[in-house]
């Protein structure tokens, strides 16, 4: 499923995006964010993260840098005395 989602994103990026123009207010662009989210978190979580990102895509949101969150398995697992585990 991830492979199919990534192929659809590539199709959008190379066929439709040039006609629409670069209008993304975020870095990385929404299509790159979606690809990374799918590859990092799998199909369902990647779709969820992408949907959350697309919901923020409107004129009243300032945009900016919005990286894909790290997968829990790659986040550190030690406990901090004041903040607990993260």
UniProtKB/Swiss-Prot annotation:
Its main location: membrane. One of its GO terms (cellular component) is plasma membrane. It comes from the Bacteria. The keyword Membrane applies. It is a peripheral membrane protein. It is found in: Cell inner membrane. SMART domains: Haemolytic. Keywords: Cell inner membrane, Cell membrane, Membrane. Could be involved in insertion of integral membrane proteins into the membrane. Belongs to the UPF0161 family. This is Putative membrane protein insertion efficiency factor. It comes from Cellvibrio japonicus (strain Ueda107).
């Amino acid at each position: 499923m991830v492979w199919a989602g990534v192929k659809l994103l590539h199709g959008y990026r190379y066929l439709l995006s040039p006609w629409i123009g670069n209008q993304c207010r975020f870095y990385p662009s929404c299509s790159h964010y979606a690809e990374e989210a799918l590859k990092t978190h799998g199909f369902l979580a990647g779709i969820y993260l992408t949907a959350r990102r697309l919901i923020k895509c409107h004129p009243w949101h300032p945009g900016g840098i919005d990286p894909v969150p790290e997968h829990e398995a790659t986040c550190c697992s030690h406990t901090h005395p004041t903040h607990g585990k993260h």
